[in-house]
Structures are given as structure tokens and as C-alpha cells.
A protein has these predicted regions:
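Active-site and donor-binding regions of nucleotide-sugar-utilizing enzymes
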Residues: 4-138
């Protein structure tokens, strides 16, 4: 299985390292607002060489809200980013109120919340009359 863990803090990174299964293919995306990120990456590569680590700038997802009105360069980046994440079996994030969480929600990329993720985009789904009828019929 292919997993990706998206970390914004040292705590997220620690939990990701605890949670990951060494037998799986694992990527960790670390955002640049983590303190001493270079030293941390060096240590992870030393002790877990099979884990791929990528650094992303925290503000990169805020610039691109919709594909429709973007330049070809931005559209290409968005397409590559969406395809990158769709290649994973599991995407793990800690809070979906972050820019990357909004990105996943906007482009309908399925993700898993770890720990006490806010589940910012959850909502109560109202039942239509037909689905209510089918639900009652099952009983």
C-alpha cells in the first residue's frame, strides 16, 4: 500500500513516524514552517531510509483556488498535484482546516484524519424521500 502523511508541526511528524508501517511505501510531506526542518529530515533519512520525505511551502496551496481562471503553468501544476495524491491508497492529514485540507476538499481527494482532526468539511447529510424509503424497507 502507498501512504502519504502530511505534517505541519513536529507533533504531526512524530505521530506519522509512529503510525507508518515500514512494509508499506510511505511518503511524508513536511511543510516549511516546522523549526529545524533540515536537521529533522536528515535524522529521518538516517533511521528510516525507506521513507520518502518532501518539503512544501506552506503558502503554495493558497494561491490556486480554481483551475478555470489560471494560466497554463498553474493548471499544469494543479493537475500534477492532483495526480500525485490520487496515486496513494491512504492520505493522512491531521487537520483539514489547513490550506492542503481545503485543496483536498475542493478537488474531491479522499483523505483520512488522524487524531483529533477538526473534520472541518463534515456536514449533516439530509436524506431524500427515496433514500429514506429504501432505509425503512431494509428494516
Amino acid at each position: 500500500m502507498k501512504n502519504v502523511y502530511i505534517c505541519h508541526t513536529n507533533y504531526h511528524l512524530l505521530l506519522s513516524l509512529i503510525k507508518l508501517n515500514i512494509e508499506d511505501t510511505n511518503d511524508i510531506i513536511i511543510f516549511d514552517d516546522i523549526i529545524n526542518v533540515d536537521r529533522i529530515i536528515k535524522n529521518i533519512k538516517e533511521y528510516c531510509p525507506q521513507v520518502q520525505i518532501y518539503i512544501r511551502k506552506n503558502n503554495i496551496y493558497s494561491k490556486f483556488k480554481k483551475i478555470s481562471f489560471k494560466t497554463n503553468k498553474v493548471r499544469k501544476w494543479l493537475f500534477e498535484e492532483i495526480e500525485y495524491f490520487k496515486n496513494f491508497n491512504n492520505i493522512y492529514i491531521f487537520n483539514d482546516f489547513t490550506r492542503v485540507g481545503v485543496f483536498f476538499h475542493q478537488y474531491k481527494i479522499i483523505y483520512n484524519l488522524i487524531e483529533d482532526g477538526y473534520n472541518y468539511f463534515s456536514f449533516v447529510k439530509s436524506l431524500s424521500l427515496k433514500s429514506l424509503y429504501l432505509y425503512i424497507k431494509k428494516l
